[in-house]
Amino acid sequence: MKKSLIIWTLTAASVFLLSAVINPAFSASKPPVVIGFIGSFNSDSGKSTLRGAEIAIEELNAKGGILGGRQIKLVKADTAEDVTEGIKAYEYLNEQEKVDFIISGSIDDVSLGWMPRMAEYRTPTLDTWTSAISAIEKVRDEYEKYKMYFMNCPTDYALGTQYVDFGKDVLAKKMNWKTAVIMQEDTAYGAGTYEFIKGDILDTAGINMLDHIVYDVNTVDFSPIYNKIIQTKPDFIYLISSVKCVVPTSQYVKLQVPIPITGINVAAVGKEFWKDTGGMGGGMSTLMPPPTLGMDMDPRTEAFIKKYQAEYKDRPVFPHFNGFNAYYGIYNAVSAAERAGGFKPLDAWVKEMENEDLKLYKDGQLWLRYAYWKPGEVEPRTGMTFPHNVKFDITPPLNDGHPSLIVIQWYTDGTVKCVYPPKYANGEFTIPPWIKK
């Protein structure tokens, strides 16, 4: 990374001071604004948030800094995707680094773990990866306690609504599929998602579940599982996979399972998916918050991607959705601070953050939007409030806010396209060529 950043590292076990590169731009008369990153150092998702933040900070520093010419100093702390380490990391950023603002790439459980400490420190914080509705419910139910918290990934509720729409519009209506087997990993995430898929997507779309298969994440031979599914003769397989996703995917292609597959495959959102599967990822589709791989992008986001790919040569070579969220989230937070006169007093910053509205246009139409639901503001389709969540739009034709969900599909030639919703689709939802129509 460029040496305009000062980076401190927190390991999973304890805090160690590794290095400090002094930038003469940090003058005594203008102390730096300290932004802290909290997330996993060793995961593709954690690196995506960190890199998105780094690029935004580099751009802002190159333009002369913020708040009257102060440079931004970035410090970071590793959660190791562990709740206890995440709490320690949040404490470290506040007590040792004295941060002004925190950008988070934490997973759900970790964010929920450090939120009580956030409420004590009163530190402005933006989450970019988690979609936990319970985090936004904390803001809604105890606003004064949690008002410093914002999330620019749509919540589970918004994602779920679009899951249902995809089931009705594509799986049931377009494909005319009426039966499914749910193939679910044996994890807490898998179990919770299964309940939602069965109760909301399949039932609402009028699709009958013929079987429910739970597999161990360490399974290496999926042929017995796929053979069982073939004997059941469903119209399609709904896969729920967030851990070791490559194995069931590559074996699906290798075995040329004669049944279409869709669902949730977390690995499929990465540019490395094709290489990781040995070129056997064709036919797999997955649901993912935007912006994401496979989408057409607006000009500003395209410029960010080019800068990212020029600067980072190791994985992830293409930012995950939270990398984009971190990039634009830094701009949101800094813009609010400029109008508020800083990140303190907290109330002034929160008010201006609630007024943030960063709109991105493509070919004259609103493409992405980084604004936030205000306290008491009602989302029209659900009739619910989502204070401080990104202002998502779940009402077709999706012309008012941030889309909550994109469905992408990998094809057998190694390309990946967006197939849903219609506004963003640049490809068609298809079945693999070895399956008879």
Regions found by a protein language model. Give the residues of each.
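Short, low-complexity disordered leader/linker segments with a strong preference
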Residues: 1-34, 434-437
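Immediate post-signal peptide segment of exported/extracytoplasmic ligand-binding proteins
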Residues: 25-37, 65-73, 170-178
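Beta-alpha junction/loop-to-helix N-cap segments that form part of ligand/metal-binding clefts
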Residues: 30-32, 45-51, 64-140, 152, ...
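Short, polar/charged alpha-helical segment
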Residues: 46-68, 195-202
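Extracytoplasmic ligand/sensor domains, especially the bilobed periplasmic-binding protein
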Residues: 99-212, 260-286
